[in-house]
Amino acid sequence: MFSRRSHGDVKKSTQKVLDPKKDVLTRLKHLRALLDNVDASDLKQFFETNYSQIYFIFYENFITLENSLKLKGNNKSQREELDSILFLFEKILQFLPERIFFRWHYQSIGSTLKKLLHTGNSIKIRCEGIRLFLLWLQALQTNCAEEQVLIFACLVPGFPAVLSSRGPCTLETLINPSPSIVDAKIYPEEITPLLPAISGEKIAEDQTCFFLQILLKYMVIQAASLEWKNKENQDTGFKFLFTLFRKYYLPHLFPSFTKLTNIYKPVLEIPHLRPKPVYVTVTRDNETIYSTKIPYMAARVVFIKWIVTFFLEKKYLTATQNTKNGVDVLPKIIQTVGGGAIQEKVPELDGAGSTEQDKSHSNSSTLSDRRLSNSSLCSIEEEHRTVYEMVQRILLSTRGYVNFVNEVFRQAFLLPSCEISVTRKVVQVYRKWILQNKPVFMEEPDKKDVAQEDADKLGLSETDSKEASSESSGHKRSSSWGRTYSFTSAMSRGCVTEEDNTNVKAGAQAMLQVFLTNAANVFLLEPCAEVPMLLREQVDASKAVLIIFRRMIMELTMNQKTWEQMLQILLRITEAVMQKPKDKHVKDLFAQSLAGLLFRTLIVAWIRANLCVYISRELWDDFLRVLSSLTEWEELITEWSNIMDSLTAVLARTVYGVEMTNLPLDKLSEQKEKKQRGKGCILEPQKGTAVGRSFSLSWRSHPDVTEPMRFRSATTSGAPGVEKARNTVRQKATEVEEFQQAESTAAADCDYLVVGQQQVPRSSSTSDITERLYSDSSQGQKVEHSQNLSSSEPKSVQESKGHVTHEHEGITMLVRRSSSPAELELKDDLQQAHGRCRQRQTSESTGSDTVVGYSNEAELPVSPWQACEEDPDLSTPTDAVADSDARHWLQLSPTDASNLTDSRECLADDCSIIAGGNLTGWHPDSAAVLWRRVLGILGDVNNIQSPKIHAKVFGYLYELWYKLAKIRDNLAISLDNQSSPSPPLLIPPLRMFASWLFKATTLPNEYKEGKLQAYKLICAMMTRRQDVLPNSDFLVHFYLVMHLGLTSEDQDVLNTIIKNCSPRFFSLGLPGFSMLVGDFITAAARVLSTDMLAAPRSEALTLLGSLVCFPNTYQEIPLLQSVPEVSDVVTGAEDVKHYLINILLKNATEEPNECARCIAICSLGVWICEELAQSASHPQVKDAINVIGVTLKFPNKIVAQVACDVLQLLVSYWEKLQMFETALPRKMAEILVATIAFLLPSAEYSSVETDKKFIVSLLLCLLDWCMALPVSALLHPVSTAVLEELHPSRAPLLDYIYRVLHCCVCGSSTYTQQSHYTLTLADLSSTDYDPFLPLANVRNSEPIQYHSSADLGNLLTVEEEKKRRSVELIPLTARMVMAHLVNHLGHYPLSGGPAVLHSLVSENHDNAHVEGTELSSEVFRSPNLQLFVFNDSTLISYLQTPAEGPAGGTSGGSLSDVRVIVRDISGKYSWDGKVLYGPLEGRLAPNGRNPSFQISGWHHHTCGPQKDLFNGEEGDDVLDKLLENIGHTSPECLLPSQLNLNEPSPTPCAMNWDQEKAIMEVILRQSAQEDEYVQRCNSDSSVTVTSQGQPSPVEPRGPFYFCRLLLDDLGMNSWDRRKNFHLLKKNSKLLRELKNLDSRQCRETHKIAVFYIAEGQEDKCSILANERGSQAYEDFVAGLGWEVDLSTHCGFMGGLQRNGSTGQTAPYYATSTVEVIFHVSTRMPSDSDDSLTKKLRHLGNDEVHIVWSEHSRDYRRGIIPTAFGDVSIIIYPMKNHMFFITITKKPEVPFFGPLFDGAIVSGKLLPSLICATCINASRAVKCLIPLYQSFYEERALYLEAIIQNHREVMTFEDFAAQVFSPSPSYSVSGTD
């Protein structure tokens, strides 16, 4: 309609506007042009100058248009003209407020506005009228009349009529009042609609809400549009309107609006539970919407949203965003009406990132389309930013307004569930105020203001306090506004009263208290479980409130009153929400949804509060009362356990100086250290974000305070050992704390972390608290420590900011910590203390340089309180993860600078708040007390009604105890492994739960699962090493509980105790422990007699096996009850022994579990040794041997192998066995022979390798028995009933041994009548031995594949090789055994000692043709040496050496000796031979007699009769004497009749006289014939020759003559020997292979490391530096073997040096089959680093370690760093001179005996049992090596290679020539 004019046209337009001659329409057009082109300041001056003409122009045009509209109707041009006129009207009201204030054109303007406000107008005109009316009313302010006030009160339809002096008023009656006098002639004209509503116009469903929004919006945006000369009047205008609104509308919107809300003097009454309202369902747009029947609820929501708009971040839009396609026909201020105003688009902070719609009050499309805008009431146009900020400032400008806003927000918390989305918006406002930008009223007031307020003591709220007496707060609206409304009366009614009290600073604490109190209403509304959507809304709102609560807990500094209010509110909420539902079958979904979050918040708040302020005992009692009444909630137990985990981590750090996430023992793992070095510490919080369940939003690092302190303990009833209430203030730590007897005897008294000089007297319920007490240098001296002193916490992360994402919040918000005033004040204190901390800061962890640095703001991802708070099913993370998250909430608020105080200063000056001091934050006393109190916060856990939850609590107690035990294990650990730290001063209370546990065992059977957990923990608690011995009261209670458990009828209880109470309990030697021995035996027997699959059978037999030595040690063991099979037993070892061994015997034959069966057999073996060592002669020894012997033929080879090991162990006790019964050692050998014969047929053809290997084990065991038994025992005839019947002449045992060996070599099918040839099992039957004792089967364990194909290379080739060797294994072993017996039986040990088994002589020794000292090629050129192969299995060297001297009657120096060197699979042997018969002095030997040889060993043994062999008379029969001598020296050559070889055999018993006479006649006839033939020849001259004389003796000169002579005597040159006797090719390759063969061992070798650990040694250096041990240790080492001088030792060295660098001596043990060298750490030098390194190399490389530990703590494998040490056998000396054995092995190592993990043995048995166990362990380790070969297998392979490659095939003639004279022409330089 109007176009823009240039600047030159402004003056012309001004003249035309003021020209009265122009018509009013023209003047209006020019005036509009001026409005568009002139600045506001110039316009105001223009309007003030020409106000009368301007109003005239407006009014005339308005009247004209009004008449035109009535006549012509509504069309577009007229509507546009109306817009222009109203635009002018608006400008008049805006530019002339001062005149309007004085009622300028009062009636005219009022009449015009009434026409616009007429209810018959269109919505657009009515909205415009409201806007212009509010402008006029703001200008009039207090000069308005009652009518204007009443019109304002009626602008929003739907409210009740306003009471006035005229009576009830509505907008209609105010616009067209009925005439007061019916007959009056003069009355106002009737006001009609200016622009009536057209049909089809969109009308809001809820017009009350719509017009209320319009009114509220225009109250704001019109407030600053009046151009007052005095700008302050803008504020006054809004305040005037707002006062009217509060007076007329507020009582209806908020009937319960109270004037008592006052954040300056808050009323903090805790709200009560409210019943749920009745909800009405409405379906709108196919969506169900819920509402209530509460009047004006929708309007109430609109008003609250309007208030919220001023305090949330608003979305400002530019003007162009509100135009549509450039159509801007209405004034901008009209266009912003926006019908969708209800749909506020406030950015949601707690939703999913999208806007939240209030679906209950949607009023879309209420205006014409062109008036719709994209904005909402929360989306404000940019030009209105200032006015919204102005109103916000006004609402926070006075105390009255501040209280009013907080009361409105309180009302929002009271909304029903269907409107709770508005409550969440209010929560967002508080969140912003509390956590981000504090409003002015939350700033701290000045001190003088505070003092003034305290003096004033105002009684009423300052919210309209002066209206309190005159205004009614009921539903009826009344007005006391008179017709002459004056400024004074307005002031008296609160319009401007607030100006008197503009000091709005109330401080944050009061605001927080009010918020806490009001926000509780969200929880205290009865949830609507019937409507899931409403329930979900309430849950979300509750969680949003809890998030703020938790942020307050974590991030804000609160005073004691605020903390107490928070705790009381949380208690009230928890009690109300979590109360049991009346109907137990109905689930309380609301409580379930909040349970975990609420419980966690409550407990954490309690912890944080106690770190910051003093919390009274009454509050603690309430806390205990509430939580102990809610133990039926599983979520409570879950959160309690999680928080206890975190508190335990803090306890570990602050009291014990241990980080649970970085334990010293974990750090000792090299692999973990590498991993940690690769990580950056800055990423640690991310782990919490990913998997954490902590609710922390704090970024502070853990304080590193580890200084122990003295302090009070917790005060929580129901916890085990809780202290009595103390009414006196705790004395300072510099004073000596005195303990009164009255305190110490109370069951509730317990100070479990005390550093003092004397031990505190304790009762039975508190004696379990473990502690160490060290005396100070003087009484009362301040405790100080040189280590673990913390300076300050690293703050580099604490002040960081990060993105925090909540599940309730869809957006990401950047949180930044800002220093509070308290922080700034603390900085000064810190600077003063800086000097004291400087010394510590130099040695503290990184980050201590940021003690007070709050400027580091690196952005970090921060773990939320709970990334998955709404998912209670998520599993609890591992310790490390939980601790990493828990570190946040366990820190203090940002002002927690007191943690920076040195603990030493704490001791001297103060203590924590919880202990009565002033220190805030985590300190040793606060950590311990809070840990204690939170532990007991569930009350007596045995009062929990739910068995499931009871079991869960006790299950967690076990986990918690395990953490405490882990802390204990990590105290005083050497991190560098170079030195051992001193013992810790404080240790965790590992017996703290005892009273709970003891009581739990007495509960009814429905609590069975919890009882089992209690028993499990009791066993774990009492099988640990006890740092402090329990007192007698505790032990009595403990023994009673254990007795009742062990004698319980419940099998599960028995199983639990037996499974968890290891033999370590017996090793502890607690006073009176032996009284439980009988109970344990009985209980173990009952466990073993059950058929339950889950029964702890192995553990039961381990317990029984550990007790086998006890009856002999404790001569009379008291029993608490009689044992079965023995009546009325009270004491006595024999009865216990008999009962125990019967159980072992039974289970050694019937036990179905493989491992348990092995343990039973080992236990029997240990017991047999014990009885033999003690010479007890127990009759059941034979029964035990019977069981072991029968087990040898058991199908399960693992079990059978254990029995074989036990038999091999008994070899060393053969003399004791012989003393026990003479025939028993022979019986052992017989058992082995018969078992081999029994198993051989099946093993030969078995495809299972273990079958063959077991036969090998039996053969080697038989060999050991043969070598140990005396020859007389082996030659003793086998006496059995069967043999006596079949064979009257019984063969000796040795014969049967050779027979079975022959069967092994040649095959079991060699003899058809095997039973007649070898011993059978039936032959063993006797009264003492039953070879057919029945054995129950066992469940075979699956064979473990230890090696992959990648480890073995070509698996196919390996398997083929293993198969080939397996076939040959039994024959090869049997050949070795026979060779060993032939060579060593009766000879071993030789005079050189057991270290020398095979010959050290080679072909170069005593060889006159060789000059070198080593075997070299020169040897092969010797004419006196020849090498042969015999039977393709043995190498034989014949060497002729010079004679050493005269032997018998030989001529001195004329003869030589013959040396035979034999190499076979069993070893290398050398025999020297001398000529026994030869020429005497001057005489030859008789005709036809060849020289013979006497064979002796290398050491030239000679026998007595041999010396006189040639000194007899001439007529003596020398042959007769020779035969006699052979029978004397080699009794094995005697005939079975035992007659001497020179004695005639007896007459055959079956020959009669006639037969004898016939034989004599035949012999005589033959003799006569021979004589006749001789005579006939003598008489015949043809056969007569000349007689020849005896030739003279010739001395042999050939260098190989005597060797050839011996070969000839042995028959080696004969044709029948030719195929088995060959020469060897002499060449360099043969030389190398001979050297290699000679370097191989001829016995099984083992090297064992032995360590000694003294008390207090836990590091490598200390252990390796030990040069001697205790006497018991030295005796043990001496019993392992015998000391050998390494410089001269000829046996196995195990890598030790002869030069003394590895020690001078070492223990050495050997039999004819085994050599063991012990690398003893105390025998090796440790005088230098190089020596230590060499010592560690030798000891560490051994596969088996023996550790003798006298330390008070268990040995850790990692102390000696090595990749070897597959098996560690640790010996712990006990108080009763017995020894507890633990065996740790890698999992792939198979079972071995005779000792087992948990065995307890006496000192007499220890060395032999340890030695045997080490040998078996070494064998078990070696069997894992692929293709491992025993020594004889290796020798056999080498011999086979030599024979195949170097055997020379030649004709007999060539062979004879080489034998006659070894040819020197054979080249050894390079021939093959």
UniProtKB/Swiss-Prot annotation:
A GO term for molecular function: protein heterodimerization activity
Residues covered by the Rap-GAP domain: 1634-1842
GO BP: activation of GTPase activity; Ral protein signal transduction; regulation of exocyst localization; regulation of protein localization; regulation of small GTPase mediated signal transduction
Region described as Disordered: spans on this chain: 350-370, 445-481, 711-730, 758-813, 831-851
Entry-linked InterPro entries: ARM-type_fold, Rap/Ran-GAP_sf, Rap/Ran_GAP_dom, RGPA/RALGAPB_N, Tuberin/Ral-act_asu
Keywords in alphabetical order: Cytoplasm, GTPase activation, Phosphoprotein
Residue spans of biased composition, Polar residues class: 758-768, 775-795, 840-849
Ranges of Basic and acidic residues composition bias in the record: 445-469, 796-810
Residues bearing PTM Phosphoserine: S373, S376, S379, S486, S696, S819, S820, S1592
Subcellular location: Cytoplasm
Function (record text): Catalytic subunit of the heterodimeric RalGAP2 complex which acts as a GTPase activator for the Ras-like small GTPases RALA and RALB.
Protein name: Ral GTPase-activating protein subunit alpha-2
